């Protein structure tokens, strides 16, 4: 199917959500109101229900979007929980820490749920949700490891970068220790290499609180 064919199908509302995503488009939801019809993209409609998505790489762009949505939802209702749905392979440590700090900063509890994969900073943010409100779907995979980095240039510059990544490793391990209840030494050992877990294993480790198969 060509792009023009797909655009023709969109015009007749016959294209699937998957096909629209292939074009970089987002499905729309039409609601009836006293003033007539109003159309929302699906993510804006779910934002009204206090659902925020972190999907794909954690970078400055995705972090800015998540931070803005958390702050907006706090201003809308500071006493109602926010749900953060995560399907991410991880990414930038600084961008992830910006999201983490905002999750702790806002007044509402931030519930976290892993769907698909939460790896690296994705797993870190999953574990950073409100205690008792961190969950995963049954076939989710969760992976923790130490921060990755590289440096080039003069020896003194490489030394500076090495000190920084070692600091970040210690800081991330300290936070993971706080949110999981595991000793820092164990966190350091377990994150030395990629450490994959099932949902049930993540519960035992303290990264999440429960595995959810169906809505209650």
Swiss-Prot record:
Q: Which organism is it from?
A: Cupriavidus pinatubonensis (strain JMP 134 / LMG 1197)
Q: Which GO terms describe its cellular component?
A: cytoplasm; endopeptidase Clp complex
As for subcellular location, the record says: Cytoplasm
Show the active-site residues. Answer: 120 (nucleophile), 145
**Biological processes annotated in GO:** protein quality control for misfolded or incompletely synthesized proteins
The organism's place on the tree of life at top rank: Bacteria
Q: GO molecular function terms here?
A: ATP-dependent peptidase activity; ATPase binding; serine-type endopeptidase activity
Assembly with partners or alone: Fourteen ClpP subunits assemble into 2 heptameric rings which stack back to back to give a disk-like structure with a central cavity, resembling the structure of eukaryotic proteasomes.
Coarse class of the protein's main subcellular location: cytoplasm
Q: What is this protein called?
A: ATP-dependent Clp protease proteolytic subunit
Tell me its family: Belongs to the peptidase S14 family.
Enzyme Commission number(s) from the entry = 3.4.21.92
Answer yes or no on keyword Protease: yes
**Which catalysed reactions does the entry list for this protein?**
Hydrolysis of proteins to small peptides in the presence of ATP and magnesium. alpha-casein is the usual test substrate. In the absence of ATP, only oligopeptides shorter than five residues are hydrolyzed (such as succinyl-Leu-Tyr-|-NHMec, and Leu-Tyr-Leu-|-Tyr-Trp, in which cleavage of the -Tyr-|-Leu- and -Tyr-|-Trp bonds also occurs)
Supply the enzyme class, top level. Answer: hydrolase
Which keywords fit this entry according to its UniProt record?
A: Cytoplasm, Hydrolase, Protease, Serine protease
State the function annotated in the UniProt record. Cleaves peptides in various proteins in a process that requires ATP hydrolysis. Has a chymotrypsin-like activity. Plays a major role in the degradation of misfolded proteins.
């Amino acid at each position: 199917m060509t792009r023009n064919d797909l655009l023709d199908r969109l015009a007749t509302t016959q294209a699937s959500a998957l096909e629209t995503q292939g074009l970089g488009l987002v499905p729309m939801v039409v609601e009836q109101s006293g003033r007539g019809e109003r159309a929302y993209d699906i993510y804006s409609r779910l934002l009204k229900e206090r659902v925020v998505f972190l999907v794909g790489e954690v970078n400055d762009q995705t972090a800015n979007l998540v931070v803005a949505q958390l702050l907006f939802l706090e201003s809308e209702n500071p006493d109602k929980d926010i749900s953060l749905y995560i399907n991410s392979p991880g990414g930038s440590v600084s961008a992830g820490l910006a999201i983490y700090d905002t999750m702790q900063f806002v007044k509402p509890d931030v519930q976290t749920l892993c769907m698909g994969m939460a790896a690296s900073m994705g797993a870190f943010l999953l574990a950073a949700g409100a205690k008792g409100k961190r969950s995963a779907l049954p076939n989710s995979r969760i992976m923790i490891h130490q921060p990755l980095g590289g440096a080039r240039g003069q020896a003194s510059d490489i030394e500076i970068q090495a000190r920084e990544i070692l600091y970040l490793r210690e800081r991330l391990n300290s936070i993971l220790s706080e949110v999981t209840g595991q000793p820092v030494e164990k966190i350091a050992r377990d994150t030395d290499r990629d450490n994959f877990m099932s949902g049930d294993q993540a519960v035992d480790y303290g990264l999440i609180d429960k595995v959810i198969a169906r809505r209650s």
